């Protein structure tokens, strides 16, 4: 990983069924993809994983938790922040933090089997995925909580 043309860490992904799937060595507060954001974009899509970020020109926090340094870095982009969590239980922690921060949250109702942004792009294409993300974004705490409850129910069944 790089930031301001400096190497700040790396990640390794195992292709078999090992746990954990990833081993990362990164500086605390790093957000993947901030260097790739364009000044004329009105929003930034915040996701958990690198492949998700690459799929939609977003930024990745590299897990389901956002620390204060990452919050400052994302806010420094000075645009609408749209958080798209993985559609799993850990992703719901990201939703809770986004609500605390007053950020928009998008939890599209994608077809069964799609658990993250990259899966959606593979299944539906980039444009359709971006459209569903932007159409599903929400700022109302109540609507976000209702959508989160419905998603958790779907995850558990």
Where in this protein do the model-derived segments appear?
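Short glycine-centered, acidic/aromatic-flanked micro-motifs in structured strand/loop junctions
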Residues: 61, 85-86
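Replication-associated primase and helicase/ATPase modules
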Residues: 1-4, 44-46, 72-85, 92-157
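Short acidic, S/G/P-rich loop/turn micro-motifs used as interaction or catalytic elements
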Residues: 66, 87-90
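Phosphate-handling DNA/RNA-contact segment within nucleic-acid enzymes
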Residues: 1-80, 94
């Amino acid at each position: 990983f790089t930031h301001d043309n400096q190497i700040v860490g790396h990640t390794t992904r195992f292709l078999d069924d090992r746990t954990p799937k990833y081993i990362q060595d990164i500086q605390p507060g790093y957000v993947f993809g901030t260097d790739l954001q364009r000044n004329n974009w009105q929003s930034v899509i915040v996701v958990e994983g690198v492949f998700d970020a690459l799929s939609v020109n977003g930024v990745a926090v590299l897990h389901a938790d956002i620390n204060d340094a990452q919050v400052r870095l994302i806010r420094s982009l000075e645009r609408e922040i749209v958080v798209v969590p993985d559609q799993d239980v850990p992703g719901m922690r990201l939703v809770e933090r986004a609500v605390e921060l007053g950020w928009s949250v998008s939890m599209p109702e994608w077809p069964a089997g799609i658990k993250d942004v990259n899966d959606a792009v593979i299944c539906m294409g980039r444009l359709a995925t971006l459209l569903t993300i932007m159409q599903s974004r929400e700022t109302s705490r109540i609507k976000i909580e209702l959508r989160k409850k419905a998603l958790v129910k779907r995850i558990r069944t």
